[in-house]
Amino acid sequence: MLQPINVSLESLNLITLAPMLIAIAGGLVILVLDLINEKLHKSLYVMLTILILVVDFGATLGLNVNERGFFDVMLIDGISIISQLMIIVGSIIFIPLALTSKRFHEYSYPEFFALFLFMIAGFQFMVASDNLILIFVGLETASLSLYTLIALHNRANSYEAAVKYFTMGALAAAFFAMGSAVVYALTGSVELYKVAEVMATRLNETGLMIAIFGSAVLLLVAFSFKLSLFPFHTWAPDVYEGASAPLAGYMSVVPKIAAFVVSIRIFGMYIDLGVEWVRVTILVLAVLTMTLANIMALVQEDVKRMLAYSSISHAGFIMAALALDTTEGTTSIFLYYALFMFTNLGAFAMLWISRHKNRRFDKRYDHPYEKFAGFIHIMPVGAVIMGLFMLSLAGVPPFSVFWGKIYVMQAAVNSGYIWLAIVMGLNSAIAAYYYLKLIVYMFLMDPVKDVDTIYYNLSKPLMAVIGMATLATVGAIFYIQPLISYLYYMISASGY
């Protein structure tokens, strides 16, 4: 006879679902508005999306730390709240980039903004749960929306990028599902805290380490795809090149924040259980990723592809902090992305401004270095701002990313990994070359003759976004200490 199911309203705790429900409801409202009136201007959808995200931000900020909800499937801890806030802030920065001075195909569709909000909800589900099934649901919700957003750019290479991303995403999802299945077979649970408890009691069993090895390898491969770690990074440059510049910048930050949070929960569990080879594997992947991506970035002819390889290198840099498995190391991950987010989105936004009606310099690339030759004479303020972003990405003090790099290196040294800090320093020196290369083109070279250079995509919303990104990049020295204190408090309160 089946046992009766008792549903406790206390265990529901639906307030933990509020941020995701706000994003989903917002997307549905936009679709309904389009059904009622198909002629509404895109600026209305932009403003409505920003309003929904602001409400979402407030709902997330109002959550209590270390709370469970929805039958204990939702986990609201410090890491969950921080990552949701960062995801929303990154999204608020991205959305105004739709209000360009020219009409672009994807932004004329209300579905673009609805899909964008559904994607945000997917990312929020990923970071606000330690249940492997809900993480998978969030991952696929966000991924399917993102594939469509890339394709909506409506160019041949955008379709190619969407198909490549879809193929790699499907492969990553398969590895994640298989890894989760092995974990469930081992422990009889898909909730990470229960998985850790069961594994801890069975570590000495014969043959168990082989099964743990299988699950960890499958999950590592899945998140290596999502974080574009070597050797699973090959899709990223082509996808970034095919996507619109703002969306490429967004993809280099927000999806990776969500993937890093899940990686912290899963691989931190393995390291805490004493599975030391997981730490070693992560360190090897991190070093190979940051080094090889930097070497590839050195030989790129296109600024957008250079920034794509740069983003891969930064992901490797941060992955090394994950292997430390300390509160300081985990804090450095969130600090780095909080600072990197403004700088990298700002850099990609500058590419969005410097558009041409036709490819004037190269048959393949949209943003070859030659395009930026003499940029200081064509658009002086833009050249200075782009130069600041490049100096920040290179880790030059006192700009924002410098503080992130220093904190990650400090965490490595304090954990006894002096060699890792040295590798990070050497990679930062290599990266400085290709960032300074663009600065040399902009400030020390003459504009290409006999070419009518047009930078025509600037609008006031874009100016506001770039101004905000510039202030965050230049003024980091004034807010870095309070930011570190807040992040450290929230992460230590979560037990990481």
Residue ranges and their predicted role:
Residues 1-496:
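Alpha-helical transmembrane segments of multi-pass membrane proteins predominantly involved
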